[in-house]
Amino acid sequence: MSYNKLKALEGNIEAISTALAIHEERRNATTAERETLSKFTGCGGIKEVLSIGTDTPIPGTMQEAVKRLLSVLSKAAKGNETLYRQVLQSLKSSVLTAFYTPTFLIQAVAEQIKDTFTANDLKMGTFLEPSAGIGGFLPVGDMATHRTAFEKDLLTGLVLSALHPDTQVFIEGFETIDSQETEHNRFDVIASNIPFGDFRVFDNTFSKKRRHLCTGFQDHP
């Protein structure tokens, strides 16, 4: 089945609107709302988003959906122009990287991890998803597993929080983990689908302490 940009964008708008309502009402999502939230796929490949606020015309088939998107973004910003620009820029920045892992691949990875733990009589106490999206890998653990997730995109993080209320969610880049008040600083399993792209993320700690690791190899017996 070919990718339908309009259908994907409309699904994203519904998911964002639902997440906003859940956040404002301080409650958990209903079963129907969870279904809506799970359809969020980000704006990867929806290049029309990049045309918002520019002179580049948006195709007629996408104009109405883009208008609805802007209305939702305005509601999310609550009249704060600075926040509105941040949300919009965050959305635009995701166009080149926000591509979600197919469910069957996540299930295959999850089953392999679970089988490994079961075969070795191990318990998964902590789990980290460092580039979570809407948390595709979070079900890897069991009911007793403490989950932590990082997602730097503002709107995606909002959906993630609504979809996984029992997960400690940080709407920040994973490189900020040392400055966050995580409940755990060691994890039994770390799994995620890291965004592809030739982009460098500034990590001050890495720059100062780990840069030499990228400049050569050492062979230790």
What residues fall within each predicted segment?
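SAM-dependent methyltransferase catalytic-core segment centered on the flexible catalytic loop
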Residues: 128-221
